[in-house]
Each structure stands twice: as structure tokens, then as C-alpha cells.
Amino acid sequence: MIYHQFPCRLKKVSLSTVKRKDLFMKTLYVSDLDGTLLRKNETLSPYTIKTINALTSSGMLFSYATARSLNTAKKVTEGLNTHFPLIIYNGAFVKDNITEEILIANYFEEDVYEVLKDLFAHEIYPIIYSYQNDIEKFSYIPAKATSGMLAFLNSRKGDKRTNIVTTESELMYGNLFYITCIDKPEKLQPFYHKYKNK
């Protein structure tokens, strides 16, 4: 929900009160997607689309920040007129919503390879997102994929970013920016506590 400098929640906004183009020019409103703008079925309600589009047409600055990629974020926000840059992959990138140009990039530093080697040593093989020759990819080793990973990957069938690999070195190739581990909680929790502040 949007609360900042606004007298009420988004769903209670009266569109008739939004008249001046400069009404919202000093505040950028940024919302999460999952669990906030999106419904449980990962869609926007017609009311949300209508309200946000009316507000942005009246001059409100609006964007969203999400753990999703630009690809999946755009699918679930179809119909939303958001022309402001978007924060994706939990802040790994800020991208232009129109041209999809990377405006800000936060790649992992070299010490990520030590973390990955630690995971591999404990039979945890994540899905790794990277840029390879200026092309966004997500790489994984099918033979090492958990049932949870396979379910996740199944929801991404046909995604042009898919990069199936067979070795650890191939999995770590490119400019890495996002790692997704999907396994049993008892297997992942020790690593969460070990690396959460790094």
C-alpha cells in the first residue's frame, strides 16, 4: 500500500480530487509488487490499474521495487502506465522501463565465488543470474536441481534467459548479480545465517 504523504490508502483515493498536474511532483511513490500491489493470483486488479494510471496521468511519480526480473515484473503489471525507472532483482538493477537500459547495476564482488564453492561443497546448486556477453541469463544444472527448483523453472518455460549448464564453472560464468537457492529449510538455514550480513 502507498502511505507516504498521502491522507489515505490507495484504495480510498477519490479520483475527483486529483486535478493539478503538479500535485505529486515532489514525491516519488515506490511500491512492492508481491503481497502489495499484486493479488494472490499474481495479477493487478482493474481498480488498481485504473487508480494508478489516473494518478500518474495527473502527475504523480510512481514506480515499483521487486525481487522479480524485469521480464516477469512487466508480465504481472501489464496495463500499468509506469514510465519511471524500475528497481528489480531486490535492487541489483535499476532499469529504464521503456528502453530497458540498465541505469544502475550492482554485481557481486569476487568473494561470491567462495560462497558458491561453499554451497557446492554441501550439495547446494543454485540458479545463478548473470550477464554473459551483455545478455541476461539464468543458469542451472538440471542434474542437481531440487524438486522446488524444477517447479520454479517450470513456471519460466520458454524464457529466453534460460541457460542450461553441466559444470560448476559454467554455472559461475559471467557477471553474477543474483543467486536463488531452493531446497529444504534445514539444508539452507545454516547458510542463510552464515551469509545474511555479507
Residue spans of the language-model regions?
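Polybasic, lysine-rich low-complexity intrinsically disordered segments
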Residues: 11-12
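Asp-based phosphoryl-transfer active-site loop
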Residues: 27-40
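Short, basic/glycine-rich phosphate-binding loops at helix/coil junctions
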Residues: 31, 93-96, 170-172
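Active-site phosphate-binding/coordination module
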Residues: 44-150
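Conserved acidic, metal-coordinating active-site core of Asp-based
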Residues: 122-124, 129-198
